[in-house]
Amino acid sequence: MTQFDKQYNSIIKDIINNGISDEEFDVRTKWDSDGTPAHTLSVISKQMRFDNSEVPILTTKKVAWKTAIKELLWIWQLKSNDVNDLNMMGVHIWDQWKQEDGTIGHAYGFQLGKKNRSLNGEKVDQVDYLLHQLKNNPSSRRHITMLWNPDELDAMALTPCVYETQWYVKHGKLHLEVRARSNDMALGNPFNVFQYNVLQRMIAQVTGYELGEYIFNIGDCHVYTRHIDNLKIQMEREQFEAPELWINPEVKDFYDFTIDDFKLINYKHGDKLLFEVAV
């Protein structure tokens, strides 16, 4: 049993047994297949903590880990909002939110790429500022990136679910705390938890720190009603030992990472489970 499997199953069980339904409300989300309202059961304010002795990825079902990393590179490295850039990587998970101009508006990578921080007399974006500050001002309590920009929320195809990171350097270790305003536990959470841990490992490597603790906070923690049956099946499945994530140790620049610099070794998992998408 992995740390992630254990915490994940505990939260799913809590939601199914104690979650509050939103069926009395008109909801924004609709089922992609038929356009009917996509209702949820939810609980609020959940936290997952990992000591990073193992990579947090589910073993009770197959997680498309390469797709998760490609999405991460699209947002954090390319700082792109262009869905075509993601399609070029063979990834189509954002196609439902693609606008007429081919982008997701001013969301995700667009916010990270805005040059709105001052550094040595120049304007830099959030990622470059973070990397510089972690190396040169490690004791700062201001190592934060923010995707939730109130001035531009209406210009986003989808407001960010994972919206904030805060980084801490303590005794030579790089700790990461992530905040998600909302998490779809069947589809979004397994991706997000894994990919932001990969981000932590990447940034620790290029800044020269050891890997510290990883904390993932969720505001609205929910399960869509059409996902419940398959989640119950998933919770009863055999759990395996965590795999090993290999990251090419030769990469010293954050922008030099490619998908070929990652390998998931000995990833044993249950069969893939299909969960319908709500948009």
From Swiss-Prot:
One function term, GO molecular function aspect: thymidylate synthase activity
Family the UniProt entry places it in: Belongs to the thymidylate synthase family. Bacterial-type ThyA subfamily.
Domain of life: Bacteria
Binding positions for dUMP per the UniProt entry: R141, R142, R181, S182, N183, D184, N192, H222, V223, Y224
Temperature dependence, free-text field: Thermostable. Active at 46 degrees Celsius.
Keywords associated with the record: Cytoplasm, Methyltransferase, Nucleotide biosynthesis, Transferase
InterPro entries: Thymidate_synth/dCMP_Mease, Thymidate_synth/dCMP_Mease_dom, Thymidate_synth/dCMP_Mease_sf, Thymidylate_synthase, Thymidylate_synthase_AS
Miscellaneous: B.subtilis strain 168 possesses two thymidylate synthases, a major form ThyA and a minor form ThyB.
Enzyme Commission number, as recorded: 2.1.1.45
Stated consequence of mutating M88K: In strain: ATCC 6633
Gene encoding the protein: thyA1
Associated pathway: Pyrimidine metabolism; dTTP biosynthesis
Protein name: Thymidylate synthase 1
Reported impact of S118N: In strain: ATCC 6633
